[in-house]
Swiss-Prot record:
The keyword Hydrolase is annotated on this UniProt entry: yes
Gene Ontology CC entries for this record: host cell endoplasmic reticulum
Catalytic activity: RNA(n) + a ribonucleoside 5'-triphosphate = RNA(n+1) + diphosphate
This protein's name: RNA1 polyprotein
Pfam families (UniProt xref): RdRP_1 (PF00680)
Domain RdRp catalytic: 299-429
Length: 729
């Protein structure tokens, strides 16, 4: 039993009912060594155990950013550096010797917010729900199937596929083989559509979790990982403050997407009327729409910043938000119960931090699929709650207390917000009162523009920032959203060289800096471009575009032109054409009597004949006869055609002693017909087949070159490969 009450020297106990073990949590907890008692206990955090001997979770300890040569900096200052990812980082100052980014990062969950008045909280949540109903139009909120949760919906805005390169979560990371990472080993498919692979640990955990959420709140295990990002120098050399992000199990993320994908789309689509600005395009006329909305009630803005926002949300508030979302989305009793149990799970969980296991009570994990949307809803609820509480305590009339939408204009993105307050109520609702009200339940709010200020004062919109961008009015319609210069200039000092050379990464950053600087001053942007061309001999005019290209970019954005995100329209204007020409090819294209290419939409590789050898390009199958089938997978290079990088071609396709060439050479020797194939067209397999032919045999070289010549007519026009790659052929 358990003690439940007491008084006047007497205690009262209650028998505990039999508790059903949570199976999906046990599969993870079998890797834990739980301490006899909790250590380092706080309101929202406690050290409860450690990973068993031999169990290790890898997290990056070296930055992916590479410092550029001095000449690349173009005389501009650097106010940011890569964050501290290891306790052995030599940049850690002496006065914080022993600083550990893992341990410091988890502390944001130590002190969640206090208790809110239940009735008032649900009252303002109902107000928010009413605002959703007012703009719901023809949106519906059905649960999507697992295939849609994985693949998204083609050509439907804000219904993208699940990120496949990110971590699979705990405990699945423990089964990685050397070189494996991400979610792909738990998926299988033809390169366009994927499904969850049967028999894997993720599929088993998914089935278990699906059953569990219909009965109770599941127990989650997250991995806390330091974030590799560029931070202000004070957060490195003065007071180190590395942020951590949470990696949640893949099966949990899939189920959350199934239940809430349509709700997220609704919030993003209706940002024109709702406070949440997730999905906003700062280059378009949307920024002006935000400015005009805020100034509808005046130009007195509270620019707010929360302290440790990620760790604030309590289970009380999460329960309220879950109820509100359920009431709004509808559905049967079972679906509502599943939704709420999923949301409540992320508020009470275990977190693996290096080798330690912590119990976390509160906050929203940053790796949660709904993180930014839920944070925005939480942010709005706090502001609305304080508004009503302050107004009532200040003696306002019931009519004034219910007039949030009349006196306030409000935009929010996660923990970022701007609150425009009508001068009519400045004496009843202002920064001082808001700061004091939030402090009562453990929430610290400061000035978002200058975090060192002890007070929170009204600012004109032109002196505010939102998403680290300012507001500059160019006309009645157009407002620019200049990004802070410190973030821009740092891009010339540090670049991410994943899958590209230092020069290519730098060029991309330089183009972005010029484009962003244009919003500060077209002259500054033009001067920087000229200086770069003058100081960097290897940089050509064609690589960074012209100032006219930059002007055209903004004109297109403001005209509502839907950009192709896979190309850079400033530098790659030739790529604005169609992806492919002509009709789909429904036959095998034979380059030679024994080497062909085809589209997997019209052919089934699983019915391969004995004398055929199929080369599957960019598929993800795990079971096939290696004497009949080979699979080629690569991370696509820059451009939009999906072709591999030059480095991959050299090390895999062109390396004579490599496994790929050996296997293809064997197939040729066995007199098999080799068929290169991919889903969605014949261009990629034709190029790959042509490369193979041009390198495999001098007698076949002519066929390979002829094939590549034809293919390159499309490839070059569409920008599928960079110019430097053509010398490979």
């Amino acid at each position: 039993g358990i003690h439940v009450a007491g008084g006047r020297g007497k205690g009262y106990a209650c028998l505990m009912p039999p508790l059903r073990p949570k199976a999906q949590a046990q599969s993870a907890q079998e890797h834990f060594e739980i301490f006899p008692y909790e250590q380092e206990t706080n309101a929202g955090l406690a050290l409860v155990g450690e990973l068993k001997q031999g169990v290790y979770v890898s997290c990056p300890t070296k930055t992916s950013f590479e410092r550029t040569p001095e000449s690349y900096h173009l005389g501009l200052p650097c106010e940011k550096e890569p964050s501290i990812l290891s306790s052995h980082d030599p940049r850690i100052p002496e006065h914080v010797e022993g600083y550990c980014p893992f341990r410091a990062g988890i502390q944001k969950y130590a002190n969640p917010m206090g208790h809110l008045d239940h009735d008032l909280m649900y009252e303002v949540a109902h107000d928010m729900q009413e605002s959703w109903h007012d703009c719901v139009q023809d949106f519906t909120f059905p649960e999507v199937d697992l295939e849609t949760a994985i693949n998204g919906i083609d050509m439907v805005e804000y219904m993208e596929c699940i990120p496949k390169s990110t971590s699979e979560g705990f405990p699945h990371v423990l089964s990685r083989a050397p070189g494996e990472k991400g979610k792909m080993r738990f998926l299988e498919g033809d390169g366009e559509k994927f499904s969850l692979r049967e028999g894997t640990s993720v599929k088993k955990a998914y089935d278990l979790l699906q059953e569990e959420i219909d009965r109770s709140v599941p127990t989650l295990v997250a991995i806390e990982c330091p974030k590799d990002e560029k931070l202000p120098l004070r957060k490195i050399y003065t007071s180190p403050k590395t942020r951590c992000f949470s990696i949640l199990p893949m099966e949990y993320n899939l189920l959350v997407r199934q239940k809430f994908l349509h709700f997220v789309r609704f919030m993003m689509k209706r940002r024109d009327v709702l406070p949440s600005q997730v999905g906003v395009n700062p280059y378009s006329l949307e920024w002006g729409a935000i400015a005009r909305r805020l100034q509808e009630v005046g130009n007195s803005i509270l620019c707010c910043d929360y302290s440790s926002f990620d760790g604030l949300m309590s289970s009380q508030v999460m329960s309220c938000i879950a109820d509100t979302m359920n009431d709004f989305m509808g559905g049967d009793v079972s679906l509502k119960r599943q939704r709420k149990n999923l949301l409540m799970a992320c508020c009470s969980r275990f977190s693996v931090v290096k080798g330690n296991v912590w119990r976390v009570e509160g906050g929203i994990p940053s790796g949660f699929p709904l993180t930014v949307v839920m944070n925005g809803i939480f942010n709005e609820l706090l502001v609305r709650y304080c508004f009503k509480k302050i107004m009532r305590e200040g003696g306002a009339t019931p009519l004034e207390c219910s007039a949030f939408d009349s006196y306030i204009r409000f935009v929010v993105y996660g923990d970022d917000n701007l609150i425009s307050v009508s001068p009519v109520i400045h004496d009843k609702f202002n920064g001082k009162l808001l700061k004091e009200c939030m402090a009562r339940f453990g929430v610290t709010i400061t000035d978002g523009k200058d975090k060192t200020l002890p007070t929170l004062e009204f600012r004109p919109l032109e002196d505010c920032d939102f998403l680290k961008r300012g507001f500059i009015q160019r006309s009645e319609l157009v407002w620019d959203a200049p990004e802070e210069r410190s973030s821009l200039y740092t891009q010339l000092h540090y670049v991410s060289t994943k899958m590209q050379s230092l020069e290519d990464a730098y060029t991309g950053n330089l183009v972005n800096v010029i484009r962003e600087l244009y919003m500060h001053s077209p002259k500054e942007a033009s001067d920087l471009r000229r200086k770069a061309l003058r100081d960097l001999p290897w940089l050509s005019r064609s690589k960074i575009g012209t100032m006219e290209n930059v002007q055209a970019f903004y004109a297109m954005q403001r005209a509502g032109y839907r950009m192709d995100e896979s190309i850079d329209v400033i530098c790659d204007l030739a790529k604005l054409g169609k992806y492919v020409k002509g009709e789909a090819c429904k036959e095998i294209v034979w380059l030679t009597p024994t080497v062909g290419a085809c589209d997997l939409r019209y052919f089934d590789w699983q019915n391969a004949k004995v004398d055929e050898f199929w080369v599957l390009c960019q598929t993800n199958y795990h079971e096939f006869d290696e004497n009949r089938v080979m699979q080629l997978c690569w991370t696509p290079g820059s451009g939009r055609g999906g072709l591999p990088t030059a480095h991959w071609l050299r090390t895999c396709m062109l390396l004579e002693k490599g496994n790929v060439r050996k296997k293809l050479h064997w197939a040729m020797a066995e007199k098999k017909k080799i068929i290169f194939c991919a889903k969605g067209g014949v261009l990629i397999p034709t190029v790959m087949a042509g490369i193979f032919l041009s390198k495999e045999d001098p007698m076949l070289n002519l066929a390979g070159v002829s094939t590549l010549t034809c293919a390159m007519e499309s490839v070059k026009t569409l920008g599928f490969l960079k110019e430097g790659n053509l010398n490979l052929f």
